[in-house]
Amino acid sequence: MNSCASINDEVITKYNELILGHISKGIIIKFSDDFKEVVFEDSFNGESFEDYINKFPQDDCRYGVYDFSYMDNKENKKNKIFFISWCPVETKIKNKIVHTATEQSIYKKLVGIDAIIKATDNTEISQSLVEERCK
């Protein structure tokens, strides 16, 4: 049994729009209902990273990509593209297996990612933790 899902072309299109066109600050990616494909779920244009993270369900896996803006130690505005692997403890085992098996495949398709964040709950991902990763 192959537990790795294929990646829908719309995911790549939305990712390219994010990093090249700056159309949104973030995207959320999920599995299709049959777990055979990774599909685009939503774009995010809100104010804060915390608002973005709050869009992730507490009981199901998601992937995300976020264009994080920050100031470096010389007060220059910088951006880092974060790939987020969200796999809450409450997620069904089958979902976790497919999520884990597919993670590297999707990460490799999204060229230009600066950093990866793996989280199972909100204590493992916050604006302050992401800012720390930017240093």
UniProtKB/Swiss-Prot annotation:
One function term, GO molecular function aspect: actin filament binding
Protein's job: Controls actin polymerization and depolymerization.
Disulfide bonds: none
Record-stated family: Belongs to the actin-binding proteins ADF family.
Coiled coil: none
The ADF-H domain, residue ranges: 3-135
Annotated keywords: Actin-binding, Cytoplasm, Cytoskeleton
Compartmental location: Cytoplasm, Cytoskeleton
Listed Gene3D superfamilies: Severin
Gene Ontology CC terms: actin cytoskeleton; cytoplasm
Main localization of the protein described in the UniProt heading: cytoplasm
InterPro entries given in the database record: ADF-H (IPR002108), ADF-H/Gelsolin-like_dom_sf (IPR029006), ADF/Cofilin (IPR017904)
Listed name of the protein: Cofilin-4
Gene Ontology BP term (one): actin filament depolymerization
